[in-house]
Amino acid sequence: MLPRSLGHSTSELSPPFDGPNGVERYVSETRSLLRKGYEKYLRRGVPFQMRNPVEELGAQVVLPPKYLDEVKRAPTDLFSFEAYSEKAFLLNYSRAPRQTEAAAHIVRVDLTRNLGKLITFYSDFAIFEVCLPLVLIRDLGALVTDLWNESALYLDKTYNSEWQTKQAYEVVCGFVARVTSVAMVGAPLCRNPVWNRIVVETTMASFGAAQAIKDKYSARWRWLAPWSESIQKDLRRIRKESIELLKPLYEDRKAAVSRSDDVQGSSEMFRDTLYWLITSNQKDRSLSGITESQLFLSLAAIHTTSATLNSFVYDWIAHPEYHGEILAEVKETLAQVQLNGGKWTLQHVAMLRKLDSFMKESARINPIGFVSIQRYTLKPYTFKDGFQLPAGVSFVFHSDGVHHDADNYPDPEKFDAYRHLHLRETVDPNRFHFASVSDSALGFGAGNHACPGRFLSAIIMKFFLIQFMTAYEMKYEHGGIERLPNHDNSNTTAPNRTVNLLVRRCDGTSNNA
């Protein structure tokens, strides 16, 4: 079935069908259906509507890029991501962790601020200047060095010189959970296996609860779900374990704030989201309230970063033609880090221009989602050209279509690892970084509501790839280098989960600082 085009409102539909209209088709063929809609409608600036397998959201409206500016400027009481998530994941019934403004703020401001002092005299750093007020910038790479040291320590303790067989996602997810936790709770809790299990389980428990509700209750009876022990037990266990682990850290940070007349002074002691949440304007700053925000941050960060990194690993294996030049760039950067006493700064991260471009191209060709900027309308809205969206409608932008539009990216099906580096050199040095967002780069969203954790995520993934380029060996257990097909599911996709990797540490090498 082709997507259905819209006229001036969502009630004006044309119904040309060319195939079955069952839910299964919209689960397994979403990417191709969206591509058809992009070519037939979105390229001409026309919205269209197609079935959404998530029944709670109703049919989804797919908007063309010309509406991006209006959506980016719209207030959250008009177009809401929180309301979209609430319906998509049944948050009112599952009681899964929710986003809070404080959690988003501390990632957007406090966390990114502590990634390093953003030097302004290199064009490579201009992207950070655009995204952050300069007055908030401090700490010369302190957190970046912490992330690097923990990444080296984790891998050194996990792998030895003997080949180990591991499922590919397990390799990356364990790394991401451990290193992300440096920014969430710091050492030593980031090394606690129970904590690392919790941050991995939170997403699966939340999605599992939503699916169990759909399976057990019709829409009329879902109000019973919060009292269902079978549905709530995993999330209750996770909350209980998290509170027990976080309590000593919570009390330490509260005491430090109480002792210090200067919050700035106590911030030198702690560089983690737990501390920043305690000192934030979050209404509920009790231990349970802070724990809830911490669980949301893990839900938002761990599996999206892991899936993206998993995809990078497959593309790295599939494209050995780029290994030599990127490895040379990495070694040059590591040499500069050593000259700085082993301390990383964002200057060093910005030297990895070829690696950054490789990652952005991998994410363009093999994204983890086909749409972005998902919103739910809380009020009716009429766009400048007269197109009307009523209240109670979910809409998205087709990021995968934008990223495969030949007007944006010539020869769009070709994997060109240096495509974005060339664009930085010839078009705009500030627009084509991995973490940058623009009207032609929608993977992280758009505007003020773009993913606030993308800078942290980018650094963690770069550190994994650097470690494996220089101190480890990694290859497919089944042999060869060809990337296996992704697993598509509705608007999302995932790198093939059936793949096993052979991993070992190279003899006599270590990047541990």
Curated annotation (Swiss-Prot):
Disulfide bonds: none annotated. CDD domains: CYP503A1-like. It is an enzyme of class 1 (oxidoreductase). Keywords: Heme, Iron, Metal-binding, Monooxygenase, Oxidoreductase. One of its GO terms (molecular function) is monooxygenase activity. Its cofactor is heme. Induction: Expressed exclusively during fungal penetration of host leaves, the time point at which plant defense reactions are triggered. Residues 1-21 are annotated as: Disordered. The keyword NADP does not apply. Pathway: Secondary metabolite biosynthesis. It comes from the Eukaryota. Its EC number is 1.-.-.-. One of its GO terms (biological process) is secondary metabolic process. Heme binds at C451. SUPFAM superfamilies: Cytochrome P450. Cytochrome P450 monooxygenase; part of the gene cluster that mediates the biosynthesis of a tyrosine-derived cytochalasan acting as a fungal signal recognized by resistant rice plants and leads to avirulence in Pi33 resistant rice cultivars. The first step in the pathway is catalyzed by the hybrid PKS-NRPS ACE1, assisted by the enoyl reductase RAP1, that are responsible for fusion of the tyrosine precursor and the polyketide backbone. Belongs to the cytochrome P450 family. This is Cytochrome P450 monooxygenase CYP3.
